[in-house]
Amino acid sequence: MEISSSPWNDGGYSPYERNRVAVSPFSSALEGEERIETSRSLGDHCFEPLPYVTNYLSIFALFGKEIFGDKGNVSSRNEYLLKKYYSLKKPFVLRHNGHALKNPDMPLQRNDILQTNFMVDKFLNRTVRSVNFNNFKIISDMQSKSGRGTKSGTNQNQSADAIQNICLPSIPSALPYFQYYRKLLTVNTKEWDILKLHSLWVPKLRKDFKDFSLYGDKNSLKPIDSHYDEDNTMKKNLFFERSPSRQTLDGKGCASKGYDISSGNMIIPSLFSEDKLPALTYHCSVELNGNIYIFGGLMPCYSYEEDAPMLNDFFVDGIKNLPPPLLPQVINNPSMVNNPHLYVASIPSCRFSKPKMGGYIPPPLLCVQGSKLTDRHIFFYGGFEIRTETRGDENGKYHLKKRLYVNNTGYILDIMSFKFTKIDIIVQPSKYNAYPTMSSRFGHLQISIDNPNRRASVHSSSMNEIHKMGSASMKQGSSITSGRLEKAAVLSSLPHNTVHTVIIFGGYRQTGDDRYEAMNDLWKIEIPVIRRGKKGYCKFSETANAILLTPSEKDKSDWPEERAFSAFSVHGTSLMDRSSLDMRLLNNLKNHFVLKPSYISQDRVVSPKPVFPMMVHGTHQDLFNSGSAAQESPKAGASASSASAASFDPDMDDNLENYIVNPGRKSSSIPMTAIGRQRLILSQEKPVGKTVVLHGGSNGLNVLDDMWLMDLECETWTPIETFAKADSSEDGDEKLDSVNVGLVGHRMESIGRICVCIGGMVQEDVDQFYSENDDEPPRKRKVDTLPLGGNFLNTIDLSTQCWEEHKITLSKKEDDEDRQDSENEDTNSNIVVGVGGTSLQCDKSIILIGGLISRRSNVKEIYLHGTITKSIFPSVNPSA
C-alpha cells in the first residue's frame, strides 16, 4: 500500500523539469509596470545562501529514497518558489491598479499577506513526500533484528533483498521509535495528518565541525604519541559525541566517557513535531508556564543546505547603516525571508508546534521584545519590519529594494486562544511638555513588573500616604523633581488591580532613511484591564498610558548613556548585600517579624489555636518547660523578657513602632530579642524588591562596556565597577584588576548570584563585520590573546563583581596535521561568536534558540544555528 501526499502541485510547475528553472513569474507584465533596462540599476549586491552548522533532520530521511522515494531537485524548486515569493512584493504603485500611495507606511493588503504566508509554508513543507510503507516495515524489521544482534532470514521477497543489499545506517537508539511508529500505521489511512504529529526530528552537525566544549583548554593541542588515543580527548567534551563516520548523533554517544554530572553539559534535544523547526534569527522568545513562544525574526527559504536556491538572478538595494548586531549580509540576503508564524516549543516533552493565530495579527517583526503580563498573556512591543519592493528587467533578473519600518504598536497574545490584541501607546502630558511623544524603537530593554499589591496584603499608613500623594501628583501632571526620579512616577497612577506595568529603556529610533539614533529614555507603560474572567482571562484596554521617567539635573551623571541591544536580567536585591550572614539574619528578624499582641499581653491565652494541628510543635505551648510554664507568674515572665532584652543590642529598642501589627488596636510591643520561644508572624508590610542588571550595548559602532543596576522599587540607577582576577603575586595573595567587558547583542541569564552572558560581539568583531572593505582579510591576533568578553560564555559573580572565564569551542579534528609546532598556533582560533539568537530559562536549564554562529578566526563566515540547545551549567564553580 502506498499513500501519496505530494505538495508539488503549485500551478503546474514540476521541479523535475530542469528547463523550467529560468521561468520568471514576471513573464506576464502587469499593466503600467516599468521594466529596468540595466541589470544593476537598483542594486549590485550579490549574496550566497548561509550554510547550517546545526540543523534538524527527520529520522526517516536517514534512509533516503528507500522510504520517501526520489525527492527530485529541491534546489530548483526553491529557486522558483523564491522568485514567486518576491513577485508578490511589487511596488505599492502597482499593487493597487496604478493608484499611487502617498503613505508608504500603509500595511499590506490581506490578500497579499495570505499569498506571502502560503509561499512561506511552501518553503517549510520539506518532508511530506510519497511514503512507501512496505519498505518502511522491511527496514523497521531489519533495524529490530540488528538491535537484537540477529541476522535477517533468507525467506524474504525480492524487495527486501534489494533493500538489504543497500548500505543502510544502523541506529540502535531509533529502534523504540520505529516500534512506536509501526503501531501508528494501524490507524485509518484517511487520517494521514495524525501521523505527522509524531514525526521525530534528530539533530545534525556539520561535517567540518566536531564537538562543542563548555570550557576551553589551552593545552588541548598536544603532540601525538603512542599513548595518545581518542578516549583521552573525549574526556574533555561535555556536550555530546558523534561517530566520525556519521553526521547524526547516536543515543549511546550523548555523554562522553569522562562525563561528570557536576561539571555541566549542553545537549541538542530531539523534537516531536509535524513541522521542522526553522533556523530563526533576530526573533523573540518568551517562556510562560513551561512553554516557549517564538515570534518574528528571519528564516532561510531552504530547510537544508543542499536545498538552497541559486541567487544569481537577485540584486538587492539593501538597508544601509545597520547598527550592530544587525548584520547586513543576513538582513539583506534574499534567501532570508520574514517569519510570519508563531511557534510553541515544550522543552520537557520535546514537542514543537505551529498554532494558528487569530485576532489582530502583527506583521513579521524583527528584534521585537516580549514580556510576561499574566500567566496567560504576553506583551510584545517595538521591533521593525522589513518591506521589500520587487522589479523585474528584460533579462529575467530580480531587483529587490528593502526598507526598514520601526513598529510603535503593542500587541498582547492570549496563549490559550492564540489571539492577538492591538494596544496603542498614548503618552501622558506634563506641565513641561504638553505634547510628548514616545519614539518607535528596537533593540530596547523591556521588563514586566509583577506588582504584589494586586493581591490583598497588609499596608502601613505610610505606604498608603505615599500612594495618595503619588496619585494626586500624577493628576496634577507634576514632573520629576525630587531624588533621581519623581516619586509620583514610581507608583502606578491607576488602581493596582486594574493595571499591568511594563518598563522600557533605550533602543534605537529611526531618524531618517537608513539613519538610527540610540536613546537612554526610561518609560513606564501602564496597560489597563477592563474585565477579568475565568482561567486568567483578561480584556485589556485598546490604549495604554506611557509615563516618561527622567533624572533630576544633579543626578544626570548616575544615568546610563544612550545604548541599544544591551543584556539585562532581573535579580533580588538581597544578592547585592555584602553584610555577614549573622547580621543579615538578625536584620531580617528585626524588620519582618513581630510578636502577636495576644501572646505578650498580661492575660495568657488558655487554649490557643494551633498553626499546624497535626504536628506536635504546632501548638503554642512551651514544650521545653510545659510543667513550669503554666505556673509561671506574669511578673516572672515580664522580668525574663526584660532581662533578655537588656542582654542584647540596646539599639534595637529604639524603633518600637516597627513591631506594631495594627496601629488601631491596643497592644503592647517588645523588641525582637525578647521573643524567646513565642510564635512569630511574618509582616507583609513591604514587597520584595527587584534589581535589573544592565550590561553593555552599543551606540552606533561603539561598543559599551559598563554595568548598571536599576532598583525597580525606587527606580534609581547605580553604576557598578567590575573586576577580573589577576595572576597571584609572589606572596600568594590574589589581586583584582578593574576591567570593563564590552559586548553588544548578547543575552544575560541569572543563576543565583551568577550572571551568564551568552554570545555577543566585542569591539574587534564589530570593526571586522562593519568594515567598508568586504574583501579585507581577517585580522590576525597574537598567539594566546583573546579580547575581554571574546568567549561565547562570560560569567560574572555579582557578590564579588568579578568576571570569570568560560569557553565554548568548536574543535576541528585534523588527523594528518603535524602538531610538533602547536605552541605557535592560535589556541583560541576555534572559539565561536554568536549573535541573533535568544536565550531563556526553562525546565531548570538555559535554552538557546536559533541565531548565527561564526568562528572567531573568521567572523565573516556565518553559519545558521537551526536547533534548540539546552545548557545545564556546573553546580560547583570549577575555578573555586
From Swiss-Prot:
Protein name: Guanine nucleotide-binding protein subunit beta 2
Subunit (UniProt): G proteins are composed of 3 units, alpha, beta and gamma. GPB1 interacts with the alpha subunit GPA2.
Tagged with keyword Nucleus: no
Stored SUPFAM superfamilies: Galactose oxidase, central domain (SSF50965)
Residue numbers carrying Phosphoserine: S24
Protein species of origin: Saccharomyces cerevisiae (strain ATCC 204508 / S288c) (Baker's yeast)
Location(s) in or outside the cell: Cytoplasm; Mitochondrion
Ranges for the Kelch repeats: 291-339, 377-425, 501-552, 691-738
Effect of mutating Y215H: In strain: Sigma 1278B
GO cellular component, one term: mitochondrion
Function description: Beta subunit of a guanine nucleotide-binding protein (G protein). G proteins are involved as modulators or transducers in various transmembrane signaling systems. The beta and gamma chains are required for the GTPase activity, for replacement of GDP by GTP, and for G protein-effector interaction. Involved in the determination of the cAMP level according to nutritional conditions, most probably as a regulator of cAMP phosphodiesterase. Required for the control of pseudohyphal and haploid invasive growth.
Main location: cytoplasm
Keywords: Cytoplasm, Kelch repeat, Mitochondrion, Phosphoprotein, Repeat, Transducer
GO MF annotations, alphabetized: cAMP-dependent protein kinase inhibitor activity; GTPase activating protein binding
